[in-house]
Amino acid sequence: MGPSRLVRGPRPQGMRSPYRRPGMGWPRPRFPRMFKCSRRRYQQGLRGRTASSAAINPATRAMGINNTHTDTTIVWIFPPQVLRHLRQPGIFLIL
């Protein structure tokens, strides 16, 4: 038995593992997978513009230099029990 074992002593019974597992924190979430949110980013393509029109119009040419705008689409996925709750009379769902 080495000296480090004598100094530290045994771990408490509640901590079985030296590392923390994700999702094991306290307090536990009330509805673990009730609401899911998916974010996807779509790159805006240069569909409407051609190279010749961008070369002619200086405003279009200047906009094309730094055109890194991406549209973010957020998709919410609800389980059936949440949808049943949202269909109750008197509840307004704004989409």
UniProtKB/Swiss-Prot annotation:
Gene Ontology process terms (BP): cytokine-mediated signaling pathway
* Region Disordered, residue ranges: 1-27
Can you tell which superkingdom this protein's organism belongs to?
Answer: Eukaryota
| The protein, known as | PIK3R3 upstream open reading frame protein
